[in-house]
């Protein structure tokens, strides 16, 4: 008589090891599919052709933007040296004592205080630049824009250092003097100039935010640049206590109000894309209510956008896997263990956070109750300007 087959007892199964094996197998499968899908010549050519489309080109140009705020310790140190840390932490202490929201932890309160300090004490909004002769900006008229190479006030080398994208030309009606206003993208330069519109505000704010909460290791991924096709940018940070990405708008000094733009400004939007270190993600469902949704296909082919996001994320995962592998090679472990550790790191740092967020962004899960405390309409910018952009709360 054949003896019955005994199932392994629970004590003989190493569930931790089994779990790791499943994670490694899943990550291997994802990377293999990425290699097959995105390293082929057909997909490379498809991606290259799509970059001829303006919206696709804009999205791709931002795919590596977070690197701007990371990895340069001297720039992060300069950010901390430039801001008034004693004032920030003094106010933070008051926030801690008066805070009644149990969902806000120390990091969250620090971000709130930085938001307040940055808007009210550090950075200045520019409707029109001040006239260097009379000091007024009340009677300054915009005349258009020029390339940095045509500037009469900024050298080409300085324009490159400051990452000047374009230079606005204005004229003071009182003095008849031409005024150049360079649109600066270098966040380190902005620590000194401390003025601009939403692009400058977000660039400078994110460098300081990274310096304060970003962490010093390669695995840290807590700040995100958020781009809107209809000419606005803002940012998010990952809250360790809430375990989610939280909306921040430094221009408005607003925290965790994703429906600010649709419900308070009355802004109609098509696409909202987020860019953090590990991946890019379509955040449109988080920020756009159905009645303010500009049909995406009226702007750009939705499938093309989805392909570019998937392609960029897939290539990014492969690059990061190689980087992690190289780091593991410095450890005194065998080659197989090095690869397995790299697979596990990729699983925890990339695949789990991305998949979790994708699930959280399902339309039925992203409904947010707008704050009744927020004023109607955009607060930064002149009345005429916000009205012309459909952001004054009347539409």
From Swiss-Prot:
Subcellular location: Cytoplasm
Binding site residues for substrate: 252
Reactions listed under catalytic activity: Hydrolysis of an N(4)-(acetyl-beta-D-glucosaminyl)asparagine residue in which the glucosamine residue may be further glycosylated, to yield a (substituted) N-acetyl-beta-D-glucosaminylamine and a peptide containing an aspartate residue
Gene Ontology molecular function: any one: peptide-N4-(N-acetyl-beta-glucosaminyl)asparagine amidase activity
UniProt binding sites for Zn(2+): 131, 134, 172, 175
Pfam families the record matches: Rad4
Cofactor info, note text: Binds 1 zinc ion per subunit.
Record flagged with keyword Zinc: yes
Record's compositionally biased regions (Basic and acidic residues): 386-395
Bias kind Polar residues: ranges: 366-385
CC terms in the record's Gene Ontology section: cytoplasm
E.C. numbers: 3.5.1.52
Keywords: Cytoplasm, Hydrolase, Metal-binding, Zinc
Main location: cytoplasm
Entry annotated with the keyword ATP-binding: no
Active site: 198, 232, 249
Residue ranges, annotated region (Disordered): 363-395
Record-linked SUPFAM superfamilies: Cysteine proteinases
Origin superkingdom: Eukaryota
Function noted in UniProt: Specifically deglycosylates the denatured form of N-linked glycoproteins in the cytoplasm and assists their proteasome-mediated degradation. Cleaves the beta-aspartyl-glucosamine (GlcNAc) of the glycan and the amide side chain of Asn, converting Asn to Asp. Prefers proteins containing high-mannose over those bearing complex type oligosaccharides. Can recognize misfolded proteins in the endoplasmic reticulum that are exported to the cytosol to be destroyed and deglycosylate them, while it has no activity toward native proteins.
Record-stated family: Belongs to the transglutaminase-like superfamily. PNGase family.
Protein name, as recorded: Peptide-N(4)-(N-acetyl-beta-glucosaminyl)asparagine amidase
Lineage: Eukaryota, Fungi, Dikarya, Ascomycota, Saccharomycotina
Gene: PNG1
